[in-house]
Amino acid sequence: MSKLFWAMLSFITRLPVPRRWSQGLDFEHYSRGIITFPLIGLLLGAISGLVFMVLQAWCGVPLAALFSVLVLALMTGGFHLDGLADTCDGVFSARSRDCMLEIMRDSRLGTHGGLALIFVVLAKILVLSELALRGEPSLASLAAACAVSRGTAALLMYRHRYAREEGLGNVFIGKIDGRQTCVTLGLAAIFAAVLLPGMHGVAAMVVTMVAIFILGQLLKRTLGGQTGDTLGAAIELGELVFLLALL
């Protein structure tokens, strides 16, 4: 289990992980690592939340929110933001399904992708600032948001098909079963409930689950399945929806 956690931490983040900690784990077994996604999200959110808390007293709420969002993006290497941009470039191109998938492969940033990045990053900064001004616990909110967003991404993997013939997303999409999905969602719910008591966290998670489920169905109808890019988009949008639900 520990090897699986370190392998997933190295796979979906840019945090330094010694290779020997995950050595011996076959790539084809990575799908079992979905249950570690909420824990990894918890770690990322906690680090981002600590940055917010430290900077808030020094430079104020807006700049603290800006740098916490920046740190979160740096820790993931912009991996999920890139997926969001590619997904929006493809889906909003109004082309055929094959053309959409080809556009999503293009490394160049399009208008729709650029707008999506600006909107999501700016929205996160504004929502975090508003939560802090309302007296909500910033560290707990960020940690829960990151845990829940990565946990609910399982909804785009379970009983979905991979829209392409190859790619990194193929490790998870269509490869996880109902038990793994329930465990992943259960862990995310526990983290949300513990970090944000009084049912606020659980209620926000329910809203996020509904939003991500609907997103998954829309993407399935549009693209014929999911890709690594759509998983990244789901994680980014999941974070934002969860934080919005806390307002």
UniProtKB/Swiss-Prot annotation:
**What is the first-listed, main subcellular location in coarse terms?**
membrane
GO-annotated biological processes: cobalamin biosynthetic process
Alphabetized Pfam families for the sequence: CobS (PF02654)
One MF term in the entry's GO annotations? cobalamin 5'-phosphate synthase activity
EC number, UniProt record: 2.7.8.26
- Name the UniProt key words of this record, in alphabetical order: Cell inner membrane, Cell membrane, Cobalamin biosynthesis, Magnesium, Membrane, Transferase, Transmembrane, Transmembrane helix
Bilayer topology annotation: Multi-pass membrane protein
> What cofactors does this protein use?
Mg(2+)
Keyword Magnesium on this protein? yes
The family database entries (InterPro entries) matched by this protein are listed as:
CobS
- Lipid biosynthesis recorded as keyword: no
Q: Per the UniProt record, which residue ranges are transmembrane?
A: 34-54, 59-79, 113-133, 194-214
Please give an example of a GO cellular component term from this record. Answer: plasma membrane
Involved pathway(s): Cofactor biosynthesis; adenosylcobalamin biosynthesis; adenosylcobalamin from cob(II)yrinate a,c-diamide: step 7/7
Cellular location of this protein? Cell inner membrane
Protein family = Belongs to the CobS family.
Job description of the protein: Joins adenosylcobinamide-GDP and alpha-ribazole to generate adenosylcobalamin (Ado-cobalamin). Also synthesizes adenosylcobalamin 5'-phosphate from adenosylcobinamide-GDP and alpha-ribazole 5'-phosphate.
* Name of the protein in its database record: Adenosylcobinamide-GDP ribazoletransferase
Which species is the source of this protein? Answer: Escherichia coli (strain ATCC 8739 / DSM 1576 / NBRC 3972 / NCIMB 8545 / WDCM 00012 / Crooks)
